[in-house]
Amino acid sequence: MFIKNGLLLSLATSVLATHGARSHSQAATSKLSKRFTFPIPNSEGSVTLDEVYEIDGETFDGGMKTYGRGVSCTGQDEGGDSDAVFIVKNGGTLKNVIIGSDQIEGVHCEGSCTIENVWWEAVCEDALSLKTGDGPFNVVGGGAQGADDKVIQHNGGGTVSISDFTVYDFGKLYRSCGNCGDQYERHVVIEGVTAVDGKYLVGINSNYGDTATIDSATCATDVKTICAEYKGTDNNDEEPEEVSDGPSDYCIYTEPLSEC
């Protein structure tokens, strides 16, 4: 059973996390450089959910409280829908929320969704998984830090727009699924993003017609690769092959991006 929108939440006066979750948060923030401070807002309180909270085509305004599940991060061991903090159904909006470190799967979207001013204090497996549907998927403001691998995982089709988002200490900001059983043409539009200390800003599957468009207002400091192209596969037992990086017909941007 999932908690439905409108049911009673379990409120807590302080962040209720296990020792492992605290350790994960400390590890994620321990690398903060003197020249960059992750601008996560102050929390207005904390909420620990016993079950995933579903937003069924409506708007949920979290009032800048910190929401978690009271569990330890399991690293890159992939969880399921029941491990998410929020599931946003088609047409739903999640806004003004901090996702705590005491969780595994962050936020899932099932269909078109808007994620507005949502912050992840420490990413576990993924921050945001766009599971199904053809979009549009809109990520407006907010930010994430401490992602060993992906921040935004795009499994459905359509277009993802990421604007005014801050990402720090990360593997990839955006990845079009490289080995999903059902593959689609996917597109990502990145505008005004601040990216610091990462491996890849974007990874796309050019063999499926994916594109990434990155505007000149996006800045990147100590990001090793801005846009990588992969040969994706529909075999989940195979790993996609990276075939190129840099500006192209599929990776649409002007090099170099400005420093943050």
From Swiss-Prot:
Keywords: Calcium, Carbohydrate metabolism, Cell wall biogenesis/degradation, Lyase, Polysaccharide degradation, Secreted, Signal. Optimum temperature is 22 degrees Celsius. It comes from Emericella nidulans (strain FGSC A4 / ATCC 38163 / CBS 112.46 / NRRL 194 / M139) (Aspergillus nidulans). Its cofactor is Ca(2+). Belongs to the polysaccharide lyase 3 family. GO terms for cellular component: extracellular region. The gene is plyH. This is Pectate lyase H. GO terms for molecular function: pectate lyase activity. Its EC number is 4.2.2.2. Coiled coil: none annotated. It is found in: Secreted. It catalyses: Eliminative cleavage of (1->4)-alpha-D-galacturonan to give oligosaccharides with 4-deoxy-alpha-D-galact-4-enuronosyl groups at their non-reducing ends.
